[in-house]
């Protein structure tokens, strides 16, 4: 790598390569410095809109020769500053690489470009009898979901991105293009490079193609909602449902604070208490059996008002409330900013971790609703702060640190599905110890000049 060239020189070269699909317009740059996270705007120097893998490879080579950082960008829905251009550089926006390349219906897999969103993918799959179930809530891009090892509401039944990504096409820091695997459902051939790039947040290479498992659309779907007097009762119900081998598709927890926000935001009348939202997939008979079994377990744990939602309209209304928890939470404190964080613990420790975290937030005076994918021990907290009060930001940071320390002490993780990004760098060594040095060795081997999404996962001295 030579010395970093000026932005104007590189912009001219990129314009010569891809024309107006290279932009230095201030509005475009600012748009790509933002995300759903609470971090300040960190825009790139240039934004490019590639259309093919070859274009990505050519631009990566040009960036490498110019010493210019490379930052992949999907839908801008990340929550830990994962796509922030902390060192400037060139942002690769994949909005034009948003196609389904191949659908293998018999094999139940698809090959897609990274810019397609999960909703776009499922719209393309309509009519095939297949669907892609990973649902992080936001309409995230498949490339972004892959890069952050995303999860979501149906992970308890269908797994996370690491379970559903079969193979990748990746452009490395030197412009080489590799395929990490074939389409076979299993392989013992060499290192598992696919898993290595899933969750790497663009720090090892740029993903240009993703092969995904897809699943049969269930014959029948039913949903249900049930409230509880305590978080413990709600979590114990969820654990009992899982341990009873009921193949629940979703089991989501909203605490009393979040239910208050949901009612106000969506004009609903739910009981403002810890509440479980369920969804069941299968045949008509099996769905009815699953729901009845879950209802009996909820009753054993003092559940209130177990209500079914069988009609599509009723299910949509129920899950619309769950999917809008960010905006419902923000409505609890108008004008506030949400510091969103997540942890994941073994489900046997979930009730303890949730209860202690709820108590911690309350004792420190924070409005901080909680929502969790309790089937796999993952929960999120939205810490609402006044952006004009630095002491609140510091308090939120301390609250998050205690939440993470609590999870790690319970043999959990500092992030269940948001990734490390900028926000969790300080906790990675606490969780993984000397394994972080191995990660750094891999990073150095694949990206010796440190140009691939710098400042993410590992500290670079630049902080938001």
Give the ranges of each region predicted by the language model.
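Noncatalytic alpha-helical scaffold of FAD-dependent oxidoreductases
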Residues: 1-464
């Amino acid at each position: 790598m030579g010395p970093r060239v000026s932005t104007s020189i590189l912009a001219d070269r990129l314009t010569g390569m891809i024309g107006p699909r290279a932009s230095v317009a201030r509005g475009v740059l600012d748009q790509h410095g933002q995300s759903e996270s609470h971090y300040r705007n960190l825009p790139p120097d240039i934004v490019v809109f590639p259309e093919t893998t070859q274009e990505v490879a050519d631009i990566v080579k040009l960036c490498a020769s110019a010493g210019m950082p490379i930052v992949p960008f999907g839908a801008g829905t990340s929550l830990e500053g994962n796509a922030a251009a902390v060192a400037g550089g060139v942002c690769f926006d994949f909005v034009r690489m948003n196609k389904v390349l191949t659908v293998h219906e018999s094999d139940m897999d698809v090959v897609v470009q990274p810019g397609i969103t999960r909703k776009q993918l499922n719209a393309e799959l309509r009519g095939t009898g297949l669907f892609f179930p990973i649902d992080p809530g936001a309409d995230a891009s498949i490339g972004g979901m892959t890069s952050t090892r995303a999860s979501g509401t149906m992970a308890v039944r269908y797994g996370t991105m690491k379970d559903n990504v079969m193979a990748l096409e990746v452009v490395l820091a030197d412009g080489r293009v590799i395929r990490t695997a074939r389409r076979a459902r299993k392989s013992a051939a060499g290192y598992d490079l696919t898993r290595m790039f899933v969750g790497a947040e663009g720090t090892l290479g740029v993903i240009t193609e993703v092969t995904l498992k897809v699943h049969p659309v269930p014959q029948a779907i039913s949903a249900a909602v049930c409230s509880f007097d305590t978080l413990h009762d709600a979590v114990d119900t969820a654990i009992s449902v899982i341990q009873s081998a009921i193949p629940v598709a979703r089991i989501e927890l909203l605490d009393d604070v979040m239910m208050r926000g949901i009612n106000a935001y969506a004009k609903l009348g739910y009981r403002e208490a810890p509440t479980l939202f369920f969804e069941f997939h299968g045949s008509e008979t099996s769905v009815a059996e699953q729901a009845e079994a879950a209802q009996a377990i909820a009753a054993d744990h003092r559940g209130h008002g177990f209500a079914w939602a069988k009609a599509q309209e009723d299910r949509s209304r129920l899950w619309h409330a769950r999917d809008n928890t960010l905006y419902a939470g923000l409505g609890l404190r108008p004008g506030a900013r949400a510091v969103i964080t997540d942890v994941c613990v073994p489900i046997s420790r979930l009730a303890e971790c949730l209860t202690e975290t709820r108590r911690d937030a309350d004792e420190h005076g924070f409005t901080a609703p909680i929502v969790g994918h309790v089937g796999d021990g993952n929960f999120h907290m939205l810490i609402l702060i006044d952006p004009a009060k630095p002491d609140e930001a510091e308090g939120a940071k301390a609250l998050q640190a205690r939440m993470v320390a609590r999870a790690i002490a319970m043999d959990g993780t500092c992030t269940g599905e948001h990734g490390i990004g900028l926000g969790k760098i300080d906790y990675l060594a606490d969780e993984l110890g000397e394994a972080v040095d191995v990660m750094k060795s891999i990073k150095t081997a694949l990206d010796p000049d440190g140009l691939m999404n710098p400042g993410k996962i590992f500290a670079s001295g630049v902080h938001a």
